[in-house]
Amino acid sequence: MLANPLSQFLIKPIIPLKALGYNISITNSAVAMIFVSIAASLLLIIAFVNSKLVPSRWQAFGEILYESNIKLVHSIIGPQGKVFFPLILTLFLFISLGNIIGMVPHAFTFTSHIIVTFSLAMIVFTTTLVYGIYRHKLGFFSLFLPKNIPLWLAPIMVIIELCVFISKPISLSLRLTANMVAGHILLKIIAWSIVSLTWFFKPLPIALVIVLIGFELFISILQAYIFTILSCVYLRDVVNLH
């Protein structure tokens, strides 16, 4: 009998806790996020704590990670975007490691839950909002009114631009969640289908699963990269009011 492919996304309490009537249990999702946070921190510490002129493998990897993200920030936002680099690097590491660790059997993919990805998107959204108002004051609201728009069209354009601005965290989070859920469901279905086959027919599906795992690992990193690219684009809009 084929197992439910959605069961891998169930949030399960590991340490049940309640306080003042609220459920604050430590779940498999929380454990996965804590593990990823520690892993990301250790990765950066190992890479840069004893930096040398001739880099080790870990230092070389850390430098590639650093340079790729700082170039991404500079190319999209510009020199003023340097202030956002820690946020962008943190998002990339957290999402990519979360996606990759979710590929491990019995591990939990927390990026498959909209509440997690939406929270990450809201961090970006709040940053753009606060920074935009701090930097441009009332001029920030000109973002919702494109230049050279006829006066009679202005109210409609303001409403449209406002809706687009508000919908950004929704689209950002849904894109990541949908890709993670779809990929993991496909792998689960194919893996369980192999179990029901006779030994003679198993080599081909197993080879297919190996290829799909490699592809899913690529997608895991790609989705983290896309998330950070779009975050940079949203931040650029408030930096330059474009």
Curated annotation (Swiss-Prot):
Cite the entry's keywords alphabetically. ATP synthesis, Cell inner membrane, Cell membrane, CF(0), Hydrogen ion transport, Ion transport, Membrane, Transmembrane, Transmembrane helix, Transport
Q: What Pfam families is this protein classified in? A: ATP-synt_A (PF00119)
Against Gene3D superfamilies, the record matches this protein to: ATP synthase, F0 complex, subunit A (1.20.120.220)
Q: How does it sit in the membrane?
A: Multi-pass membrane protein
**GO MF entry, a single one:** proton-transporting ATP synthase activity, rotational mechanism
An annotated GO cellular component of this protein is: proton-transporting ATP synthase complex
Q: Known InterPro entries for this protein?
A: ATP_synth_F0_asu, ATP_synth_F0_asu_AS, ATP_synth_F0_asu_bact/mt, F0_ATP_A_sf
Q: Which CDD domains match?
A: ATP-synt_Fo_a_6 (cd00310)
Where in the cell? Answer: Cell inner membrane
The transmembrane residues are: 29-49, 83-103, 114-134, 140-160, 181-201, 206-226
According to the record's subunit comment, the protein's assembly and interactions are: F-type ATPases have 2 components, CF(1) - the catalytic core - and CF(0) - the membrane proton channel. CF(1) has five subunits: alpha(3), beta(3), gamma(1), delta(1), epsilon(1). CF(0) has three main subunits: a(1), b(2) and c(9-12). The alpha and beta chains form an alternating ring which encloses part of the gamma chain. CF(1) is attached to CF(0) by a central stalk formed by the gamma and epsilon chains, while a peripheral stalk is formed by the delta and b chains.
Q: Which family does it belong to?
A: Belongs to the ATPase A chain family.
So what does this one do?
Key component of the proton channel; it plays a direct role in the translocation of protons across the membrane.
Stated name of the protein: ATP synthase subunit a
Please tell me the species this chain comes from: Orientia tsutsugamushi (strain Boryong) (Rickettsia tsutsugamushi)
The gene name on file is atpB
